[in-house]
Amino acid sequence: MLTEGLSIDAKGGGRFGAHLQLPARGRGPVVMVAQEIFGVNPFMTEVLAWLASEGFVGLCPDLYWRHGPGIEFDPNDEVQRARALGMFRDYKLEDGVADLRATVAYAASQPFCDGGVAVIGYCLGGALAYEVAAEGFAQCCVGYYGVGFEKRLERARLVKTPSMFHMGTNDHFVTAEARQLITNAFEANPAIALHWYDAGHSFARASSPNFSPEATRTANARTLEMLKRMKPIGTIGQ
């Protein structure tokens, strides 16, 4: 069952909402879902349902709350897409990292948390998953077509958390030069698994013109394999 209306204390004051989806047994390892640039939209709730069907607790915080509660955009509407891109340009990654840290603390204190706490992010959320991996406050990090990695390559050396990143070789946000830089930096760290797919940006969202069922199936299978190896809270680097 999808639960809305949760409220999480933010660092520095304020509160933000989150969507929660429990597995059939009512508890399990927690996977935070970090949104695309389009907010907590139907795709994010689809991801929550998928995770719950696999035995995980899905928890998706509203990372745009500083601009207003419950903001979401339709990626297939040109006007809304432009607004989402504008919000992304103004978004501060450090705010997202702080909110995900607060979400980890919230999740770890709840009776539904039985195991570790991981993060899966898409697009903007993929970039945040990379930052969380570098900060080391989740037990597992997965990013789908994260943006801007080539601007923060030095962070790759800091990653000790088991991490996995799924990228498309046809992603228009990632140049050929950036692909090589990302590959070199990520493959130098054994904690990071990097996978490239013959696909474009947003290949895992069914409503995207770049949707690739084959890439999505493979990426999701690899993600689940990593999540099922996740260690309990407090065991990073052990």
Swiss-Prot record:
Its EC number is 3.1.1.45. One of its GO terms (biological process) is catabolic process. It is an enzyme of class 3 (hydrolase). InterPro entries: AB_hydrolase_fold (IPR029058), Dienelactn_hydro (IPR002925), Dienelactone_hydrolase-like (IPR051049). SUPFAM superfamilies: alpha/beta-Hydrolases. The active site is at residues 123, 171, 201. Keywords: Aromatic hydrocarbons catabolism, Hydrolase, Plasmid, Serine esterase. Monomer. This is Carboxymethylenebutenolidase. It comes from Pseudomonas sp. (strain P51).
